[in-house]
């Protein structure tokens, strides 16, 4: 009698295949990250843009592209990238938080606060968003709320306490 069970296990070839369909993307992404670390932001932008030519919806590459643009003081392009991410995923907390930083740089603290609150709504455990909320509230002279947000950020990540001591945004707190 023959066993008619279908073989659903992976073959040895499938498990150890040397082909990585994301090899080029991953290589460009890592190179872009290293260029960012070396403060070669224009070159990093080129790497992330190459990734996006192949996959225009690669959110991870878009986040790094926007962050690089932001640090090149190309705020309008950074904002365009973050808006595109939010078109793909309106609940992306990192995009909301980074968008808040662009508004902060433009000294538009109310808009920055609105964006960072959307980041927190998307991920209530996002410590950096809570920290930034504390900064923005401080800049808007809402000291008690600023302290509450800072306290929450420190509960999530204790390193934020050390950071806040040196942060000029908390001078009036």
Annotate each predicted stretch with a short phrase.
Residues 8-10, 37-50, 71-84, 105-118, ...:
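Structural signature of tandem alpha-helical TPR/SEL1-like repeats
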Residues 9-27:
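TPR-adjacent "capping" and linker segments in tetratricopeptide-repeat scaffold/adaptor proteins
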Residues 21-54, 60, 67-71:
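Alpha-helical segment of the N-proximal tetratricopeptide repeat
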Residues 64, 98, 132, 166-167:
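Canonical tetratricopeptide repeat
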């Amino acid at each position: 009698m023959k066993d008619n069970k279908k073989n659903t296990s992976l073959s040895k070839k499938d498990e150890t295949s040397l082909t990585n369909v994301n090899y080029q993307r991953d290589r460009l992404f890592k190179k872009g990250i290293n260029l960012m670390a070396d403060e070669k932001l224009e070159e990093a932008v080129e790497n992330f843009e190459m990734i996006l030519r192949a996959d225009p919806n690669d959110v991870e590459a878009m986040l790094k592209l926007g962050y690089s643009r932001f640090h090149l003081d190309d705020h309008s392009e950074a904002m365009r990238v973050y808006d595109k991410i939010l078109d793909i995923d309106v609940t992306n907390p990192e995009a909301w938080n980074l968008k808040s930083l662009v508004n902060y740089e433009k000294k538009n603290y109310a808009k920055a606060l609105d964006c960072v609150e959307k980041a927190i709504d998307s991920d209530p455990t996002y410590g950096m968003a809570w920290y930034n909320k504390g900064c923005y509230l401080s800049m808007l002279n809402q000291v008690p709320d600023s302290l509450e947000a800072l306290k929450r950020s420190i509960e999530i990540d204790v390193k934020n306490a050390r950071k806040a001591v040196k942060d000029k945004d908390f001078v009036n707190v």
